[in-house]
């Protein structure tokens, strides 16, 4: 398991007072879902507001792709998600965006200085949050 990705995500985008708990949960298999659940509905409690570039339900795939191209790591990155088939996998931005759009649960894509988080889908489109550590 690549815990460097989790540590990078936590240190860049989580508020300082919540980092230790989130990292503990992400690293412990029996608690991993607890950590991901925190981003389903009340992500604003955990994310560093200063790093949020954009959030909403109407963010297009094109916008997501453009921000990854501008601030990401050569169009590749890592997923952190509920679906174990993709969790901690390296993949292209296109593949990650497809997973973010089509999976009903929370998913995070980290690429370079950008992170895209999709919340749990309840009704209508999912909420998408774009974070950037150098914006």
Name each model feature, range by range:
Residues 1-124, 132-135:
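Structured alpha/beta or helical-core interaction and ligand-binding surfaces enriched in interleaved
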């Amino acid at each position: 398991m690549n815990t460097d990705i989790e540590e990078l995500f936590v240190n860049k985008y989580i508020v300082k007072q919540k980092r230790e708990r989130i990292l503990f949960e992400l690293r412990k298999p029996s608690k991993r879902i607890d950590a991901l659940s925190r981003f389903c509905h009340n992500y604003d409690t955990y994310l560093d507001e200063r790093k949020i570039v954009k959030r909403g339900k109407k963010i297009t795939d094109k916008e997501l792709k453009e921000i990854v191209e501008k601030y990401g790591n050569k169009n590749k990155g890592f997923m952190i998600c509920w679906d174990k088939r993709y969790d901690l996998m390296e993949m292209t931005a296109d593949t990650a965006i497809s997973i973010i759009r089509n999976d009903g649960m929370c998913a995070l894509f980290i690429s370079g200085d950008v992170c895209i988080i999709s919340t749990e889908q309840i009704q209508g489109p999912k909420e998408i949050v774009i974070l950037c550590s150098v914006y």
